Amino acid sequence: MNPAAEAEFNILLATDSYKVTHYKQYPPNTSKVYSYFECREKKTENSKLRKVKYEETVFYGLQYILNKYLKGKVVTKEKIQEAKDVYKEHFQDDVFNEKGWNYILEKYDGHLPIEIKAVPEGFVIPRGNVLFTVENTDPECYWLTNWIETILVQSWYPITVATNSREQKKILAKYLLETSGNLDGLEYKLHDFGYRGVSSQETAGIGASAHLVNFKGTDTVAGLALIKKYYGTKDPVPGYSVPAAEHSTITAWGKDHEKDAFEHIVTQFSSVPVSVVSDSYDIYNACEKIWGEDLRHLIVSRSTQAPLIIRPDSGNPLDTVLKVLEILGKKFPVTENSKGYKLLPPYLRVIQGDGVDINTLQEIVEGMKQKMWSIENIAFGSGGGLLQKLTRDLLNCSFKCSYVVTNGLGINVFKDPVADPNKRSKKGRLSLHRTPAGNFVTLEEGKGDLEEYGQDLLHTVFKNGKVTKSYSFDEIRKNAQLNIELEAAHH
């Protein structure tokens, strides 16, 4: 086998081991398995445990999975043989469903006889509602629905990144509006610094793209190509960055030459924004003496379009930001905006890119507001907190079977564990609707078939190996906008 073929993705090997044995476990004469995905509501959670509630989620990332892994001819003779060999050793037994996969290869030319219906990407849906459903379209392939659970549930990651990023956008929007009276620059207030902090190149691409649903600033280049390939934008790129220093480009000049490093860098990038990490030795000395005195003449001459952005990168994030602002406020002319908050001159800004997650972000903007500093003065960079410090449990992303057909009879099925009512699952065929008041509601047990409830918001996105509906990244961004943004645009 050539190396290229060896490296090719094999859906037969992309499932949890136990699922390989499940075709032998369903009731005899099962002809349909219908399952759904949701971000479960936590009904009994002690509200004091978590500062952020995450009451709604951004649906994003299924389209990538369908296009990269599930569409087209995904079953071949070679892949069946490879899986057969692996599972014989892995289980030390011949448990693999070779016959079932050969059926898909022969009858459907290796295309998956599956239908997936999903809410439009970018939609913001309260927890506890159905987000997508999966069912087999060939009665012989009842076992296939939950075989692909494993890969489909990995959508938890882009959903969670997009949701957490949007919750941070809510915080920033609230404080920016309160301290400035407008939302100018909101989409550049949280910059993705997470490339090195994630577990893989693929994670970087997916996570960065999910953040870009809400914002436009990123240093995680991998997100750009993923969006271009799987979603598309009207603009040439969906995300932007600016020249910036790292510690090596400062410390390489030597400890006694930090001023020379700073001077060189701001001169190299005189007509665009430039971010300069300033804590290599002493952030407070850098702000007061180097920026505030020695190089002050170079800073005050910069344009509004090309500010110096000072980057602290150590210490307690809130304390450091406040002290940096205080020092800069003494060294540069501060004005008061229409809301009565202090504003640095337009050629000078701050970015805090260390220790930033949704909780510290809230603390910093609240602390700034209390000290009468406008959020206009600052932007944030977040890495691990944005792309890596998240799990499937944060939003309780879950995939469960809700309906089966056995011996020609449809049955609504569910789980309801005695020890955890939060884990109870939905019953029967599901649909998602909007009430006349505009709220989302999930109807169970096939009730959505009744016309009185209006259209189902779940649309077929995949059927029998084909992606049947796609969303552009621009549509997704529009769907995910904050209410506060829509109101501001309206005014």
From Swiss-Prot:
Localisation per UniProt entry: Nucleus; Cytoplasm; Secreted
Subcellular location, principal: nucleus
Mechanisms controlling activity: Inhibited by FK866. FK866 competes for the same binding site as nicotinamide, but due to its very low dissociation rate, it is essentially an irreversible inhibitor.
UniProt pathway annotation: Cofactor biosynthesis; NAD(+) biosynthesis; nicotinamide D-ribonucleotide from 5-phospho-alpha-D-ribose 1-diphosphate and nicotinamide: step 1/1
Ligand binding (beta-nicotinamide D-ribonucleotide): 219, 311-313, 353-354, 384, 392
Keyword entries, A-Z: Acetylation, Biological rhythms, Cytokine, Cytoplasm, Glycosyltransferase, Nucleus, Phosphoprotein, Pyridine nucleotide biosynthesis, Secreted, Transferase
Catalytic reaction list: beta-nicotinamide D-ribonucleotide + diphosphate = 5-phospho-alpha-D-ribose 1-diphosphate + nicotinamide + H(+)
Effect ascribed to mutating residue 247 to A: Reduces activity towards nicotinamide
Enzyme Commission number(s): 2.4.2.12
Gene Ontology MF annotations: cytokine activity; identical protein binding; nicotinamide phosphoribosyltransferase activity
Expression by tissue: Expressed in large amounts in bone marrow, liver tissue, and muscle. Also present in heart, placenta, lung, and kidney tissues.
Single GO BP term: positive regulation of gene expression
SUPFAM superfamilies in the cross-refs: Nicotinate/Quinolinate PRTase C-terminal domain-like (SSF51690)
GO cellular component, one term: cytosol
Residues binding diphosphate, per UniProt: 196, 247, 311
Assembly with partners or alone: Homodimer.
Protein family (similarity comment): Belongs to the NAPRTase family.
Database matches in NCBIfam families: PRK09198.1
Protein name, UniProt field: Nicotinamide phosphoribosyltransferase
Organism from which the protein derives: Homo sapiens (Human)
Lineage: Eukaryota, Metazoa, Chordata, Craniata, Vertebrata
